[in-house]
Amino acid sequence: MKYLPILLLLLMACQPITETKTTKKSMLDFKYPYKTKFVDLSNDVKVAYIDEGKGDKTLIFIHGLGSYLPAWQKNIAVLKADYRCIAMDLPGYPKSSKGDDTYNMTFFAEVILEMIDELKLKNSVLIGHSMGGQIAMMAALKSPELLQSLILIDPAGIERFTPQEATILKSLVTQEAVKNTPTEQIKKNFDINFAAGVTPEDALFMYNDRLYMRDTELEYEHYCRMIPKCIAGMLDEPVFDNLKNIKMPTLLLFGEQDYLIPNKYFHADLTTESVATTAQSQIINSQLFMVPNAGHFAMWDNSTAVNGHIQAFLKK
């Protein structure tokens, strides 16, 4: 397991299941900052989402691997003043349905696009973080006519991996590995997402919710099966070679202290900024900003800067 500490975007996924469960709990018990709604889609998929604010544009927030919709609350609190803001739990994640799905990037992108159609959303802007950024790019490539623009925050899918590297990464994150990660490693996995190298006090609820997951029995078993599928999906469906086909206005935001992009083990010659500038060079109509005092969770670490960049971009 010598590779585990340096896995790109995989560290958040692994959770322990070492405690004996004595009470019936559910991820539906999680406290969300806004009222949760649900929309039924095809193939028995049900998506939990929040819908706040009004405006001429609809901002659709897509979380990353192992995350959930509350990760966007610092952004929605500000942006809902001028825009309609919709954030969801992707299928398989806390309050959404948990079926026997593929959980690859195509699956998630199709869910996003169907949701746009089902809710009759107009002037839609996808805002994706990490894996959510890769999903947003996939959706933009599949149905650009449904979208107005893209905002990608520390997105996955830009850094490329060889088949051998991908095989190693996938082999390390199995259902059993997800279950058996020690509690102290969970905390380290959260800490590495933030610029200070420690989870800030106002983000500890994410860590606590993750620990709570262990006692949700069948829901957690599903989560442990799903995470490896998500990882395989990111690695098996790269978008880099198709980035030049994204024509819509795109905002790229990367935290200057992103410790997950690039992968330090496989790509020690790269920097976060070099990955970011590569993305900008490939997406024709894009602009890039490096966010100071921000790690992989840039939208949380420096929400003021991120919100400012989003507002300026949307007003153009």
Sequence positions of predicted segments:
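Active-site loop/oxyanion-hole signature of alpha/beta-hydrolase fold enzymes
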Residues: 32, 42-44, 50, 90-127, ...
